[in-house]
Amino acid sequence: MFVLVEMVDTVRIPPWQFERKLNDSIAEELNKKLANKVVYNVGLCICLFDITKLEDAYVFPGDGASHTKVHFRCVVFHPFLDEILIGKIKGCSPEGVHVSLGFFDDILIPPESLQQPAKFDEAEQVWVWEYETEEGAHDLYMDTGEEIRFRVVDESFVDTSPTGPSSADATTSSEELPKKEAPYTLVGSISEPGLGLLSWWTSN
């Protein structure tokens, strides 16, 4: 679920921080820049793990700050495909079951990846597994807040870097702005025995 990723970045340290230890100042700046940020095709950065190498620092004309090229390792949330995770149901919609891990919310289990047969209860706004028993179908509700075990089957990165307006965009009104996409999304599945709500598989 968590991996160490080697990165390189140039860190700017303002003059009023020169009295501090360089490593402490650099660590603080890197955490400010990367913590809780999604790096495209890498994952969600959690925190700095360690600094492996500091290159020479430079002060450029007109800027009293030091600029140091830093090699470091960062703790990144990037589960591998087919990994089993446990989260909580954040909500349900016709698009599927939305799951949260507490620190990461952009997880979707689409309808075709639920335990089958499944239906969406419009009145309750929840997905229901119509579990077949000898006495007939027994409805198992996927309520908000329930713990759920799922398999990661896909991931999607979206480049959310800011771009300049195009000529076509200039003619549209502000009310027609496109919906903001999540920079990193996981797709899950519970269509296997043992997956789904933890309460379904609790032995008596």
Swiss-Prot record:
- The UniProt annotation puts the region (Disordered) at 158-179
What InterPro entries does the record tag this protein with? Answer: NA-bd_OB-fold, RNA_pol_III_Rbc25, RNA_pol_Rpb7-like_N_sf, RNAP_E/RPC8, Rpb7-like, Rpb7-like_N
Sequence ranges of Polar residues compositional bias: 158-175
List the Gene3D superfamilies hit by this protein, alphabetically.
Nucleic acid-binding proteins, RNA polymerase Rpb7-like, N-terminal domain
Q: Which Pfam families match?
A: RNA_pol_Rbc25, SHS2_Rpb7-N
Q: Which GO terms describe its molecular function?
A: DNA binding; DNA-directed RNA polymerase activity
Q: A cellular component term (GO) from this record?
A: cytosol
Assigned keywords, A-Z: Antiviral defense, DNA-directed RNA polymerase, Immunity, Innate immunity, Nucleus, Transcription
Q: Which domain of life is it from?
A: Eukaryota
GO BP terms, alphabetized = defense response to virus; innate immune response; nucleobase-containing compound metabolic process; transcription by RNA polymerase III; transcription initiation at RNA polymerase III promoter
Checking SUPFAM superfamilies in the record gives:
N-terminal, heterodimerisation domain of RBP7 (RpoE), Nucleic acid-binding proteins
Where in the cell?
Nucleus
Main function: DNA-dependent RNA polymerase catalyzes the transcription of DNA into RNA using the four ribonucleoside triphosphates as substrates. Specific peripheric component of RNA polymerase III (Pol III) which synthesizes small non-coding RNAs including 5S rRNA, snRNAs, tRNAs and miRNAs from at least 500 distinct genomic loci. With CRCP/RPC9 forms a mobile stalk that protrudes from Pol III core and functions primarily in transcription initiation. Pol III plays a key role in sensing and limiting infection by intracellular bacteria and DNA viruses.
**Hey, which family's this protein in?**
Belongs to the eukaryotic RPB7/RPC8 RNA polymerase subunit family.
Q: Which PANTHER family match?
A: DNA-DIRECTED RNA POLYMERASE II, III (PTHR12709), DNA-DIRECTED RNA POLYMERASE III SUBUNIT RPC8 (PTHR12709:SF1)
Please give the NCBIfam families that the UniProt record associates with this protein: rpoE (TIGR00448)
Tell me how this protein assembles: Component of the RNA polymerase III complex consisting of 17 subunits: a ten-subunit horseshoe-shaped catalytic core composed of POLR3A/RPC1, POLR3B/RPC2, POLR1C/RPAC1, POLR1D/RPAC2, POLR3K/RPC10, POLR2E/RPABC1, POLR2F/RPABC2, POLR2H/RPABC3, POLR2K/RPABC4 and POLR2L/RPABC5; a mobile stalk composed of two subunits POLR3H/RPC8 and CRCP/RPC9, protruding from the core and functioning primarily in transcription initiation; and additional subunits homologous to general transcription factors of the RNA polymerase II machinery, POLR3C/RPC3-POLR3F/RPC6-POLR3G/RPC7 heterotrimer required for transcription initiation and POLR3D/RPC4-POLR3E/RPC5 heterodimer involved in both transcription initiation and termination.
Identification of the protein by name: DNA-directed RNA polymerase III subunit RPC8
Q: Please name the source species.
A: Homo sapiens (Human)
Point out the gene that encodes the protein.
Answer: POLR3H
